[in-house]
Amino acid sequence: MLNPYLLRNELHLTAKKLLKKGYKLNISKISSMEEKRKTLQIQTENLQFKHNALSNLFKENKNIKNKNELLRHQVIQSSKDLNASKIELNSLKEKIHHFSMCIPNIPSDDVPEGNTSINNKEIKYWGQKKKYDFEIQDHIELGKKFNELDWKSSAQMSGSRFVIMKGKIALLHRALSQFMLDLHTLKHGYIESYVPYLVHSEALYGTGQLPKFSDDLFHINLTDKKKYILIPTGEVPLTNLVYDQIIDEKDLPIMLTAHTPCFRSEASSYGRDTKGLIRLHQFDKVELVQIVKPEKSYEALEKLTNHAEKVLQLLNLPYRKMLLCTGDTGFAAVKTYDLEVWFPSEKKYREVSSCSNMSDFQARRIKARYRKKSEQKNFFVHTLNGSGLAIGRTLAAILENYQHSNGRIEIPKVLQKKYMQGLEFIN
């Protein structure tokens, strides 16, 4: 959530910046609630002062019968007035909190303005697109040809947007996750974690998926009191590992990674990419999360994005790096880079990683702070996250980019010996 100071003292400037993200802040509503909060805050403080004074006076005059009886009634009434004011104030604070939870983060000043992906800025291209002297097939056709991507069986048991992988393609899927985890832990310094795939709603409020994106989540309601949500990304449990913590300054940065399945209903993308591995209800991803000091977060974003890029470079997959415009930047992010890998069958780039700086937006929600030794004060950390990478989409890109005219799929050299049991081709 945003720093409350911005909504109390820089309201119109904040509203102007939020408009760049396509969010129209209800200035009159927040102003009205804040004015009422100030009035109730002063009223409650005055009633507390009055109640304390009457209570002390009552104690001082407890031996004077007539006066004590009058004071007793005044103390009782002041207590009722104070409690009523506190209830009203807390109720209003809850409304302000709920209102604030629906406000997105403010985009960074260096993010290009725009409403759609057409306004995203190309930062760089990497790798050479292969030229084919034969008619190429997409990953769906290739999977069917090898009988190792089975949509028919998955549809029978689970419906659309699921897939069953078999044989060498299943092995390649596993190999990719192990390769990514080894790279990020052994070369980039991340700590691997195994995390829950079912979380309470509070965890998703903390990272910003709730309340806005509830329809895109899978909810499991066992009883009225026992409710879970399947994680849409490893970002959720990894970021919540620092929930309500005060971290020693010397322990920053914290760099975490995990391989998890991700579950998304894709309600907001109905009708898009209904076939193939691009947009599934269940897919795997290696997630990267960093917890850093505020002054280091933009530098950390560049490093985190480079870590994700290294996966694509070692797999020798052509890609481009895009800086998202304000309207395309996510709800909780101030700045986001997308890494898009080349799909030759479509002659287009597809997102395979999204790397974002969330500033203190998530930290305020989950109360994640660090203690600054020089000042002996607590400050909110900054959080970052990114895919390193989405495994299914990476696999699909390999199938398409590494196909040969004889129908075989070459295995990227970095995977062959260590991760693919010495296999060089999928036949």
UniProtKB/Swiss-Prot annotation:
Lineage, opening ranks: Bacteria, Pseudomonadati, Pseudomonadota, Gammaproteobacteria, Enterobacterales
Pathway terms, separated by semicolons: Aminoacyl-tRNA biosynthesis; selenocysteinyl-tRNA(Sec) biosynthesis; L-seryl-tRNA(Sec) from L-serine and tRNA(Sec): step 1/1
Binding annotation for L-serine: 233-235, 287, 387
Entry keyword Transferase: no
Compartments where located: Cytoplasm
Species this chain originates from: Buchnera aphidicola subsp. Acyrthosiphon pisum (strain APS)
Function: Catalyzes the attachment of serine to tRNA(Ser). Is also able to aminoacylate tRNA(Sec) with serine, to form the misacylated tRNA L-seryl-tRNA(Sec), which will be further converted into selenocysteinyl-tRNA(Sec).
Gene3D superfamilies per the UniProt record, alphabetical: Bira Bifunctional Protein, Domain 2, Serine-tRNA synthetase, tRNA binding domain
Protein name: Serine--tRNA ligase
Keyword match ATP-binding: yes
Main location (coarse class): cytoplasm
Superkingdom assignment: Bacteria
